[in-house]
Amino acid sequence: MTFDKFIIWLMAIGILLGAGDRLLKNRFGLGQKFEEGLNAMGPLALSMVGIVSLSPVISNILGPIIIPFYKFLGADPAMFASILANDMGGYQLALSLGENKEIALFSGLIVASMLGCTIVFSIPVALGLIEEKDKEFFAKGLLIGLSTIPLGSIVGGLVMKINIKILLINIIPIILISLMLILGLKFFQGKMIKGVLYFGKFIMWMSTIGLAAAAFESLTGVVLIKGMAPITEGMSVVVNIGIVLLGTFPILTLIINLLDKPLRKLGKNIGLDSTSVAGIIFSLANSIPVFKMLKDMNNKGKIINVAWLVAATSTLGAHLGFTAGVESEMIIPVILSKLFAGVSAVIIALIFTRNTTEKKSI
């Protein structure tokens, strides 16, 4: 049995465990996670289906601009799609723009799960949840996390067995975008953050308009936006992901419980408080609780947590579920790339925070 199939079987067992615990009135906390997996389909549909339906339209509009530019760089146009999160249209747009399916999968599933997720999800969501006094630490962690995305991407590409020369050429746009974000956050933090927030709102508008237009066309047959994919295409992807998430969340709960003690011991050895260690564990499932917990971490923990979650967020949660739902053979490359980039970011953050005071900011 391959590792990909092992993961799928593990998720399937998680479904049975979650369903069984639900019948036992959530005695072990797995029944609730089973329900959360199904409930995740609503938010997923809101963020995904509109962009999926609009992907052919976006491809037709941007193609004449993006394709020549990326060809000039020697890269596949699919790499452009990595500025969107994998589960927020990045995967579908990569397939629409891509000339090489292997590179499209690399961009839409690996790079988009780190770079795109940071741009359209992590930054906008975090800035709405963290306190003003923590924005300095958030920015520092963000800079470190962004710097390791190209490293994680290379690892993922090598695991996919992409030719090293082709891989390095296609990494160039990612390095350029990461560098622009790093320099922008370093020297024009306010303007850069405002720009990212506007971009996030633009994506939300696009997904809402796309969803409404596709739903209207499905019910009436009247085409509002020419060239859109049918709404059923996006909905079928959401359903596939939802099935996987039914088992992902219960299994993830068990994994987090297993990792809790060893990670807390490790955290104590490197100067992290218990909240910081919990944040690292929770972000493997979802980063939203971590942003809410940031105020209770010591300064070192804040920087390390943000650096880690830039790439590692949802590695064993929604991103695993999404990958398993659309391209199960990509599970290993996605997991390894995100973890490698995340661990690399933590190592760099530990070096940079050696002299950081452990006292919580006031």
Feature roles, as predicted:
Residues Q32, E36-D76, I83, E99-E102, ...:
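Helix-loop-helix hairpins and the membrane-proximal interhelical loops
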Residues L73-T148, D273-E327:
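Alpha-helical membrane segments and immediately flanking helix-loop junctions
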Residues G42-S59, N86-Q92, I149-G152, N286, ...:
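A generic, lipid-embedded transmembrane alpha helix
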Residues T248, P262-K268, T275-I280, A285:
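Intrinsically disordered, low-complexity segments enriched in Gly and acidic/Ser/Thr residues
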Residues G14, P64, Y91-Q92, F121, ...:
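A generic alpha-helix surface/boundary motif
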Residues M1-G50, S107-L115, V120-G247, G321-I362:
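Signature of multi-pass transmembrane helix bundles
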Residues L54-I61, A94-K101, L158-V159, L219-L224:
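Transmembrane alpha-helix boundary signature
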